[in-house]
C-alpha cells in the first residue's frame, strides 16, 4: 500500500526545492569598475567623518567641524575628481553601485525615493519580478550626516552576468543630500558578512553569500587601482593581476567584518614589530591607523602637521612621502608614498591619506591601502590573501 502521507510530504519537498531561488553554476566572473566624474566636491574631512560614523565611533570635534564648515559644492570635474562604480542590474534597471566590503546591505535609489532626492540618479522600480517583504525595513547613517532608509523587496539581481532571483533589495524611501548630490552613485552593494545586514526584523543575505555556492570557489578578489578603474573577480583568482604568490592570513569575522592582523609595519626604512589589527574595507577611502603610527608617519614628512581646521594631517603639496608597509606572514604589503597624497585642500597643502582611527577601536585598511594590492576575500576560511599588483 502506498503511504499517501509520505508521498504528499515528498511531493511538497520536491516542489519547495524546485521553487527555491538558485544561482546558475559558474566557474567565476569579473566585473570592472567604471570611472565617472564626480558631481560634487566634498572636503576630505567628510570622508574621515563618514568612516567614524560607519563604525559607530564618535566623530572627533575637529573632524566634524571641518566637514560641516566645508559642506558640499558643485564643481566642474577634472581628471582628479573621478570615482569608480560598478554596473549592476536590479530587477529591470541598471544602476551604478559602490561595492563595499565594510557593510552588508544592498540598497538603491528607487521609485519610492522622492523625485527631488533621486534627480540625476538611475533608480530601481519594483516590477513584476519584485516581491515586497512585509514588515521589513532598513536604515543606515554615517558620521558625515549621510543617511538612507526604506522598505525591502526580493528581486532578481545580476552582477557580471550572474543572477540571483531572490536577492534582498533595500529600496530607499528617504535619502540625505550627501547621497543625493553624488549623482553617479545609485546605491551600494555590501560584501561584508551577512550577520551585520541592517534589515529588520530579519537580516538578509548579501549577494555574495547567495551566489558563492555556485562559484568554483567561494571567493572574490579585488584589484582596485590608483587613479584608474579597478576590477572584482568572483569565484577565482587571476594570476595576470598580481606578482609572486598570494599570502593568506586568518580572518576574525565575529563582528561581521573582514578583520585580520598584520604582524608589523614599516615607514620608509624604519620598521616596527607592533601588530596592527584592522579590516579590509573597499567602502572607506582612507587608511586609518592608531595615533602613534600616524604621528610617526608624518614625522618623516617635511612640513607635515595636524591642522585642526582641516580635521587631519596635511603637508606641503611638494613634499616627498615615504612608503608605508605592513608585514603579513612572510609577505610585505607596500603602499607607495604617492598613494598617500590624498587631496588638495588649498594654499599649497595636501590632506594625507593616512589619518587617525581614534575611537573606532581598530584600524581600517581602506582604498589608500587596497589600491596597491590584489586582495582575495575567501569565505571558506574565512581568510584574506594578499599579493602585490602586477
From Swiss-Prot:
Q: Which domain of life is it from?
A: Eukaryota
Q: Which residues form the propeptide?
A: 20-67
What molecular function terms (GO) are annotated for this protein? Answer: aspartic-type endopeptidase activity
Enzyme active site: 100, 281
Which reactions fall under this protein's catalytic activity? Hydrolysis of proteins with broad specificity. Generally favors hydrophobic residues in P1 and P1', but also accepts Lys in P1, which leads to activation of trypsinogen. Does not clot milk
- A GO CC term? extracellular region
Looking at the Swiss-Prot or TrEMBL record, what is one Pfam family this protein matches?
Asp
Q: Where is the signal peptide, in residue numbers? A: 1-19
Concerning SUPFAM superfamilies, the annotation shows: Acid proteases (SSF50630)
**What keywords sit in the KW lines?**
Aspartyl protease, Hydrolase, Protease, Secreted, Signal, Zymogen
**Subcellular location, record wording:** Secreted
Tell me how temperature affects activity.
Optimum temperature is 60 degrees Celsius.
The top EC class is: hydrolase
Q: Which GO terms describe its biological process?
A: proteolysis
Activity regulation, in the record's words, is: Inhibited by the microbial peptide pepstatin A.
Entry keyword Mitochondrion: no
Family membership: Belongs to the peptidase A1 family.
Subunit-structure text: Monomer.
User: What other remark does the UniProt record contain for this protein?
Assistant: Used in Japanese cuisine. During the fermentation process of Katsuobushi - dried, smoked and fermented meat of the skipjack tuna (bonito) Katsuwonus pelamis - aspartic protease plays a role in the decolorisation of Katsuobushi from a dark reddish-brown to pale pink by the hydrolysis of heme proteins. The change in color gives Katsuobushi a higher ranking and price.
Supply the name of the protein.
Aspergillopepsin-1
Q: Tell me which species this is from.
A: Aspergillus pseudoglaucus (Eurotium repens)
Cite the source lineage. Eukaryota, Fungi, Dikarya, Ascomycota, Pezizomycotina
Please state the gene responsible for encoding this protein: pepA
Amino acid at each position: 500500500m502506498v503511504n499517501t502521507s509520505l508521498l504528499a510530504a515528498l511531493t511538497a519537498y520536491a516542489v519547495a526545492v524546485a521553487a527555491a531561488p538558485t544561482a546558475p553554476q559558474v566557474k567565476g566572473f569579473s566585473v570592472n569598475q567604471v570611472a565617472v566624474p564626480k558631481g560634487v566636491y566634498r572636503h576630505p574631512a567628510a570622508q574621515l567623518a563618514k568612516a567614524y560614523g560607519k563604525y559607530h565611533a564618535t566623530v572627533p570635534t575637529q573632524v566634524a567641524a571641518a566637514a560641516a564648515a566645508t559642506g558640499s559644492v558643485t564643481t566642474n570635474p577634472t581628471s582628479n575628481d573621478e570615482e569608480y562604480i560598478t554596473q549592476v542590474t536590479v530587477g529591470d534597471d541598471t544602476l551604478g553601485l559602490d561595492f563595499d566590503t565594510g557593510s552588508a546591505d544592498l540598497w538603491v535609489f528607487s521609485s519610492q525615493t522622492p523625485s527631488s532626492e533621486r534627480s540625476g540618479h538611475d533608480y530601481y522600480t519594483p516590477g513584476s519580478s519584485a516581491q515586497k517583504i512585509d514588515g521589513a525595513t532598513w536604515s543606515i547613517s554615517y558620521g558625515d550626516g549621510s543617511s538612507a532608509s526604506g522598505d525591502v523587496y526580493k528581486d532578481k539581481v545580476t552582477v557580471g552576468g550572474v543572477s540571483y532571483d531572490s536577492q534582498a533589495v533595500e529600496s530607499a524611501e528617504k535619502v540625505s543630500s550627501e547621497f543625493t548630490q553624488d549623482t553617479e552613485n545609485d546605491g551600494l552593494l555590501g560584501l561584508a558578512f551577512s550577520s551585520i545586514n541592517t534589515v529588520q526584523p530579519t537580516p538578509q543575505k548579501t549577494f555574495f553569500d547567495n551566489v558563492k555556492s555556485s562559484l568554483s570557489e567561494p571567493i572574490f578578489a579585488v584589484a582596485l587601482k590608483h587613479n584608474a578603474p579597478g576590477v572584482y573577480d568572483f569565484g577565482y583568482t587571476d594570476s595576470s593581476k598580481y606578482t609572486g604568490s598570494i599570502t593568506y592570513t586568518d580572518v576574525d569575522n565575529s563582528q561581521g567584518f573582514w578583520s585580520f592582523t598584520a604582524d608589523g609595519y614599516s615607514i620608509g626604512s624604519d620598521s616596527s614589530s607592533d601588530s596592527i589589527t584592522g579590516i579590509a574595507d573597499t567602502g572607506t577611502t582612507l587608511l586609518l591607523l592608531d595615533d602613534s603610527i600616524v604621528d610617526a608617519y608624518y614625522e618623516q614628512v617635511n612640513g607635515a602637521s595636524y591642522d585642526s581646521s582641516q580635521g587631519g594631517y596635511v603637508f606641503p603639496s611638494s613634499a616627498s612621502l615615504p612608503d608605508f608597509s605592513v608585514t603579513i606572514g612572510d609577505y610585505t604589503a607596500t603602499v607607495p608614498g604617492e598613494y598617500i597624497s590624498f587631496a588638495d585642500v588649498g594654499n599649497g597643502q595636501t590632506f594625507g591619506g593616512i589619518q587617525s582611527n581614534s575611537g573606532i577601536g581598530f584600524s581600517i585598511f581602506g582604498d589608500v591601502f587596497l589600491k596597491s594590492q590584489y586582495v582575495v576575500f575567501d569565505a571558506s576560511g574565512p581568510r584574506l590573501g594578499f599579493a602585490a599588483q602586477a
